[in-house]
Structures are given as structure tokens and as C-alpha cells.
């Protein structure tokens, strides 16, 4: 009996040892897997959040002091100079105005906030946000959380109650950056304001004919989140880089959806841009096919100027579609270069021919060599390393924000695109990561 008992004791001990080995093995495997996933995640973040942004002006031979002065002058011209587009109201508010159209619109207001947070201009940012929230953001009803897209800043009468989806896109991203840069305990809870827009966006289900800013079936931004405008899009509203920012910093439980939207936007741009010229239509269906309207015939016009800059932004910040984006930049710059780098005009049919219908701007209905398009096309010189593209960089360096020979002058749209592009090419347009615990 003693021998039998001794044998069973050995067997029981062996079982316990085997169980311990299994537990140790499983725990080790889990730890290695978790560590691997963590390493991959950190590697991805480090790859695009290193803080290293190319200064293409410096690479082109311009001095850093000259570069800083040029960027600062462009900022001061828009925000403080005699032709400024930024106007302070009382002690705590301000607005950005599209001078030629005699209004303030969410496009320019949210651009102003993005510029302010990039340059660490907290007071400017706060003033524009307070004005936007007070006079444009809907605080109740089906549109709650959204913004009226246009208002007369003198009479404060809204030109429309409806939203233009790109305004909200920039407001949200700018607020998240402000939260990262300044924290949320300095008078405005930037994170809460960004989340409010997003949370209200997710409540929109068609009640009152108002929808999500993003068509949730197509996973693409809508032209307007209302009625039929929810069913098509504007290529210049496609900012995949911004969705990546939302996925990382909004923390609203929709991270995967935003990542999907970023990927969908990238693929959409492949379809929307002409295979030879790189040109896109101002408005398209979600397929990328042009979507002409009674007020906007098919063609590459003012809205579309922003597309090359948006593609540059995605390339510089995240670089997840490099092969196509590098090919796009060569095609797009190559087409404009073929028209004359100092003379290419600003509206085209997608095949590069001259359109029959010319869109008017500021009372002028004519084609011109516009600073805005020169600026955004120059920003694409950051895509890849093509020495030939430095001709655009030099052309932008030598350009000036001033009236054209016929008297037309647009410090608002030309000016903002010019400033954004100077920021890009000097390495000053960056992802703002959290700087406060």
C-alpha cells in the first residue's frame, strides 16, 4: 500500500508541475503577443509623430531667418495688417471674414482656428471660437451642435441655417489640437467642445432631414448633412489625416469608424482625380464621378484648389498611401507645368481643357493665374523627393499676396491657402500631440 500511495503522490505532483508549466507558457505567450502589438503600435506612432517635418524652403536654399520672416509676414498680413481678414469684437471675440463675399463663414473661421493653434496664438483661437459658438452654433433643435455656414458679420443675420460639412471638420480637429496644446483648464474646455460636436453628430438620424456629417453607409463626408446633400460629396472636404486625428484623440468610441473613413477617403481620391491631369471635379458622387449642379457645372474650380494641399497633409502627417500620392503629385504638377508655371489658369475641365462656364469670384468672371492654386500645387512638392518640383517652391517664394492687375484682390481665400502652403513648406504645419497630462 505504501508503494502504491507513493506512486500516486508522484503522479499528482507531476500533474501539478505540468499545469504550472502550461500556465507559465500561456502567460508568456500572451505577454509576448501583447508586447508585440504594443511595439507595433508605438512604431506606427513614432513613424509619423517624430516631430520631424521637412522644411522644403530650407532644402531649396533659403535661409531660416528669411523663411521665418516670410511666414510671419503672411500671418500678420491676414490677422493684423491693413488688408486683414481677422476682426476683433469687444474684449473676447473675433471673426474671420470673406471680404469679397461680405460674410463670415465656417470655412474661414475654422481655418483661422487651425492657424492660431499651429502658431500657439491662444487668444486669437479663443476669440474666434467664442464668436463661432455664440453666433453660428445651433444650441437646440435637429441641428443642435452644428453651425450655420454663413452670416453677415455686421448685421449678424445668418445667410443660411444649414451647415457646410468641412467647417465642422476643421472646428473639431482644431479643438482637439487646442486641447492637446493648452489643456482644458484655461477658460475653455476644448476637448468637451470637440466632443459636443461629435456627440451631437452621432445623434443625427434624419430627424428634421438632418444627418451625420459623414454618410455612415459610404463612410465619406457629405456635401451638407441635410436632405439630398447627404448623398454626395465635395472632394476638397476629404481630409483623411483629420479622421486619423479623431481616431487618436477624440476617444468617443468611434475610433475604427474614423480609421475606416480615412482609408475610404484615400481610395475615393484615387477615383475622383483624373488619371492623366490629376484634376478633380468640385462636386462628385461617392464613386468619384462628377456631380454637376445648377450652380456648379462639372469642372475643377475654386473648391478643388484645396485637394492637392489636403493630399499633401495626409502624406506628411501619416504617409499611408505614398505610392499613389507620389504619382498624383507628379501628374498634377506636371499638368500645371505644361501650362506654364507662371501662367497656368485656375479653372479646367478634368481633361485639362478650358471650360465653357467660368465661375465668378468677387464680381470678376475670368480665368487668372491665381495665388491660391499656385500655393496648394506648390505644397505637393513635399510629396516624394523630386528635385524638379522645386520650381513650384521657388515660384511660391517669389509670389505676393497683392491685387491683380485688373484690381481683383482676395486676401481671404488666396491669402489663407497661401499661408497654409507656406506653413507646409516650412515644416510648420504639424500634428499637435498632448503637451499636458
Task: For every predicted segment, state its role.
Residues 137, 183, 202, 206-207, ...:
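Helix-capping and short linker residues that terminate individual alpha-solenoid repeat units
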Residues 112, 124-125, 187, 194, ...:
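Solenoid-repeat scaffolds in large eukaryotic assemblies
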Residues 127-134, 176-177, 192-202:
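Active-site-adjacent structural elements in enzyme catalytic domains
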Residues 1-36:
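Bacterial Sec-dependent N-terminal signal peptides
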Residues 37-73, 102-106, 144-146, 160-166, ...:
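Extended ligand-binding clefts on enzyme/binding-domain cores
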Residues 42-168, 174, 181-184, 304, ...:
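N-terminal carbohydrate-binding/catalytic regions of secreted carbohydrate-active enzymes
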Amino acid at each position: 500500500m505504501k508503494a502504491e500511495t507513493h506512486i500516486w503522490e508522484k503522479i499528482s505532483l507531476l500533474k501539478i508541475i505540468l499545469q504550472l508549466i502550461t500556465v507559465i507558457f500561456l502567460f508568456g505567450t500572451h505577454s509576448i503577443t501583447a508586447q508585440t502589438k504594443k511595439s507595433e503600435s508605438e512604431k506606427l506612432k513614432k513613424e509619423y509623430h517624430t516631430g520631424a517635418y521637412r522644411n522644403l524652403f530650407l532644402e531649396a536654399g533659403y535661409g531660416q531667418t528669411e523663411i521665418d520672416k516670410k511666414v510671419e509676414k503672411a500671418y500678420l498680413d491676414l490677422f493684423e495688417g491693413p488688408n486683414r481678414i481677422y476682426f476683433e469684437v469687444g474684449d473676447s471675440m473675433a471673426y474671420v471674414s470673406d471680404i469679397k463675399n461680405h460674410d463670415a463663414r465656417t470655412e474661414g473661421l475654422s481655418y483661422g482656428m487651425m492657424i492660431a493653434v499651429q502658431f500657439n496664438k491662444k487668444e486669437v483661437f479663443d476669440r474666434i471660437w467664442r464668436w463661432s459658438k455664440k453666433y453660428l452654433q445651433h444650441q437646440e433643435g435637429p441641428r443642435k451642435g452644428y453651425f450655420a455656414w454663413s452670416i453677415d458679420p455686421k448685421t449678424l443675420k445668418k445667410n443660411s441655417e444649414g451647415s457646410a460639412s468641412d467647417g465642422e471638420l476643421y472646428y473639431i480637429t482644431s479643438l482637439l489640437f487646442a486641447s492637446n496644446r493648452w489643456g482644458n483648464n484655461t477658460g475653455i474646455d476644448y476637448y468637451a467642445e470637440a466632443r459636443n460636436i461629435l456627440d451631437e453628430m452621432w445623434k443625427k438620424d434624419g430627424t428634421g432631414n438632418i444627418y451625420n456629417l459623414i454618410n455612415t453607409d459610404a463612410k465619406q463626408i457629405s456635401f451638407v448633412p441635410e436632405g439630398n446633400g447627404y448623398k454626395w460629396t465635395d472632394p476638397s472636404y476629404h481630409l483623411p489625416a483629420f479622421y486619423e486625428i479623431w481616431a487618436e484623440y477624440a476617444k468617443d468610441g468611434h475610433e475604427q469608424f474614423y480609421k475606416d473613413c480615412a482609408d475610404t477617403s484615400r481610395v475615393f481620391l484615387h477615383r475622383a482625380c483624373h488619371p492623366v491631369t490629376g484634376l478633380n471635379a468640385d462636386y462628385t458622387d461617392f464613386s468619384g464621378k462628377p456631380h454637376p449642379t445648377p450652380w456648379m457645372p462639372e469642372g475643377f474650380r475654386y473648391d478643388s484648389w484645396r485637394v492637392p494641399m489636403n493630399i499633401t497633409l495626409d502624406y506628411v502627417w501619416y504617409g499611408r498611401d505614398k505610392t499613389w500620392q507620389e504619382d498624383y503629385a507628379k501628374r498634377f504638377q506636371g499638368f500645371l507645368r505644361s501650362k506654364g508655371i507662371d501662367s497656368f489658369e485656375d479653372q479646367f475641365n478634368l481633361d485639362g481643357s478650358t471650360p465653357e462656364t467660368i465661375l465668378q469670384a468677387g464680381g470678376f468672371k475670368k480665368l487668372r493665374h491665381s495665388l491660391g492654386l499656385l500655393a496648394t500645387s506648390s505644397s505637393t512638392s513635399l510629396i516624394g523627393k523630386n528635385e524638379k518640383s522645386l520650381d513650384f517652391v521657388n515660384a511660391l517664394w517669389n509670389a505676393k499676396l497683392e491685387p491683380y492687375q485688373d484690381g481683383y484682390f482676395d486676401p481671404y481665400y488666396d491669402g489663407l491657402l497661401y499661408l497654409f502652403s507656406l506653413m507646409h513648406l516650412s515644416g510648420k504645419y504639424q500634428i499637435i500631440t498632448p503637451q499636458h497630462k
